[in-house]
Amino acid sequence: MLNVLLCVDGSRESNKAVKNFVQMVAALREMPQVHLLTVHRPVPGIGGMSRALSKGSLHKYYKEETDSALKSAQALLRKARIDCVVHAEVGDIASTIVRLAGKQHCDMIYMGTRGMGAVSGLVMGSTATKVLHLASVPVVLVH
């Protein structure tokens, strides 16, 4: 069974990746194991701000961000009758994606790119570029 890490952030690009993924799954003979991941950058410790936030308010913030990032992707997967295991992490986005792919023994990483403008090498997304360099499994980037 194919084991896939599907990475989302709630953006239009990540929703396009989920829609593309759903189309790919329809062509498969066997339903893959799907790990749906969203990663948040840590709240910076600017001027003692992180110390001023309680663990409860920080947890609430990350939960709200997670719910927002996952909402559309979960709806698209549910509509396509694709089950998934949800993961929400805090940390460096690219290294967290690669770490979780390894931990879950994923066969591939599936994710969207950022806008591809005139400076596509820079804008493709430092996250997408870093994942490509760090990953030991195939990475599917959907534009």
Predicted regions and their residues:
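Phosphate- and divalent-cation-binding pockets in alpha/beta enzyme and binding domains
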Residues: 16, 96, 118
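Small/aliphatic-rich secondary-structure junction motif
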Residues: 2-53, 82
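Gly/Ser-rich helix-loop-strand patches that form or flank binding pockets
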Residues: 3, 99-143
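Structural beta-alpha unit
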Residues: 75-109
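A short acidic, glycine-rich active-site loop
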Residues: 54-68
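Class I S-adenosyl-L-methionine
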Residues: 22, 71-78
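General small-molecule cofactor/ligand-binding pocket signal
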Residues: 35-37, 85-89, 140
